[in-house]
Amino acid sequence: MTFKRRNGGRNKHNRGHVNPIRCSNCGKCCPKDKAIKRFIVRNIVEQAAIRDVQEASVYEGYTLPKLYAKTQYCVSCAIHSHVVRVRSRTNRRVRTPPPRFTRRKEDTPKPGQPGQAPRPAGPGAAAAPRV
């Protein structure tokens, strides 16, 4: 029978059994080696209040502590929440991490928003308005 993945979707090589974990999203029981694990590092204080907290701090140069959280998802929750994405048969074998997208700056206008110049007329442009 053909197989989809070289590892069978698990990281259990030559172990008979691994203990289950609970999904952080839905609570489903999932083997620890099959679960999709992500380590989230965030600031304890939200971005808008960091400067206020640092100015109110007694200590000079005090670095705010971070919040470390390990989330473990079952396969269905990871796909549903776009933690991992479905890949084509050839791309499943690619082991390099996907490119990280940078956020668009807030001051650049999005296409089709007010304040943007109209599109130039071209071969695919709409016909002249009827009178």
Swiss-Prot record:
Ribonucleoprotein keyword on record = yes
Region Disordered: which residues? 86-131
Pfam families found in the cross-reference section? Ribosomal_S26e (PF01283)
Bias regions of kind Low complexity — which residues?
113-131
Question: Domain of life here?
Answer: Eukaryota
**InterPro entries assigned:** Ribosomal_eS26, Ribosomal_eS26_CS, Ribosomal_eS26_sf
Basic residues: which segments have biased composition? 86-95
Name the Gene Ontology molecular function terms of this record. Answer: mRNA binding; structural constituent of ribosome
GO CC, alphabetical: cytosolic small ribosomal subunit
> What UniProt keywords are attached to this protein's entry?
Ribonucleoprotein, Ribosomal protein
Q: Which GO terms describe its biological process?
A: translation
Looking at the keywords, is Signal present?
no
Q: Which PANTHER family match?
A: 40S RIBOSOMAL PROTEIN S26
Concerning its family, UniProt says: Belongs to the eukaryotic ribosomal protein eS26 family.
Q: What is this protein called?
A: Small ribosomal subunit protein eS26y
> Can you name the source organism?
Arabidopsis thaliana
Q: Which gene encodes it?
A: RPS26A
